[in-house]
A protein has these predicted regions:
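Extracellular beta-rich ligand/substrate-recognition surface
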Residues: 5-12
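Short, flexible, mixed-charge acidic loops at enzyme active sites
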Residues: 44-49, 96-100
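NAD(P)H dinucleotide-binding glycine-rich loop of Rossmann-like/cofactor-binding domains
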Residues: 75-126
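Glycine-rich beta-strand-centered segment in the early N-terminal region that forms part
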Residues: 20-37, 45-88
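Extreme N-terminal starter segment of soluble prokaryotic enzymes
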Residues: 1-2
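Short loop segments at secondary-structure junctions
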Residues: 9, 67-72, 95-98
Length: 126
């Protein structure tokens, strides 16, 4: 699968090939449909400044479809349309029991399409 990564120094953004994540019992695997690049926190703070940022931290707004669920996950099912705090990547694993980000993933209502849902993480902060 492909994901966006950042090397050291300014403006070094690239697409790299990495394995599809394996999920734990409390995680779901999402096949990404859309990710949102934030002008402030990503373009300026992460891409323009010279310090390296952890690759898993590249991105935080994603929508897609659940394609696999861990054995302890009962709140999401395969095929669910979701928005998540997750990086720019073709596939991402999201921990449904993560208490640091509450919630880090939500089901999108039928009336909300995946493009609209991409703004969910931004709409939760003020």
């Amino acid at each position: 699968m492909k994901r966006i990564a950042k090397a050291k120094n300014k403006f070094n953004i690239f697409i790299e090939e990495v394995p599809i994540p394996k999920i734990s019992p409390t995680e779901v695997l999402i096949k990404s449909k859309y990710t949102l690049v934030s002008r402030g926190s990503e373009i300026w703070r992460r891409y323009v400044r010279p310090e390296a940022i952890q690759q898993k931290m590249m991105g935080y707004c994603l929508t897609g479809e659940v394609v696999e669920t861990g054995s302890l996950v009962d709140s999401f099912s395969i095929g669910d349309k979701v928005a998540a705090v997750a990086p720019h990547s073709e596939y991402v694993s999201v921990d449904t029991a993560d208490k640091k980000l509450t919630p880090s993933i939500v089901k999108l209502p039928d009336k909300v399409d995946l493009i609209e849902g991409i703004f969910w993480p931004l709409s939760t902060s003020a």
